[in-house]
Amino acid sequence: MGKDTIADIITSIRNAQMAKKGTVRIASTNLTENVVKILLREGFIENVRKHRESNKDFLVLTLRHRRTRKGIYRTILKRISRPGLRIYSNYQGIPKILGGIGIVIVSTSRGIMTDREARLQGIGGEMLCYIC
């Protein structure tokens, strides 16, 4: 776990998918909780629960499974803005991922939201990551 909590979330989920694990445990911060709420609301993860262990809070994510096969549902997660190179955009410049099928998570002055919500409210911000 490094100082880039968004990259830690993405890496943990990606590693769990490749190892065919059903759950992921990540450190709980305000930023990670907001990003995980968006992932849960958009259907990219199945369940979230808070876990406290030795005075540290963790989030336990249950990854979404395919209905027909036993495998984990594969999602593509990529970090856009990073600590060394921040990427900002106004609401018109936020990209549409796969023609609107995927989502971009944007950190705005009104909180963390999806690209659709940012476009509807007419506000831009820092593009954190995209999921498709």
UniProtKB/Swiss-Prot annotation:
One of its GO terms (molecular function) is structural constituent of ribosome. NCBIfam families: PRK00136.1. It comes from Acorus calamus. SUPFAM superfamilies: Ribosomal protein S8. InterPro entries: Ribosomal_uS8 (IPR000630), Ribosomal_uS8_CS (IPR047863), Ribosomal_uS8_sf (IPR035987). Part of the 30S ribosomal subunit. The keyword Glycoprotein does not apply. One of the primary rRNA binding proteins, it binds directly to 16S rRNA central domain where it helps coordinate assembly of the platform of the 30S subunit. Keywords: Chloroplast, Plastid, Ribonucleoprotein, Ribosomal protein, RNA-binding, rRNA-binding. This is Small ribosomal subunit protein uS8c.
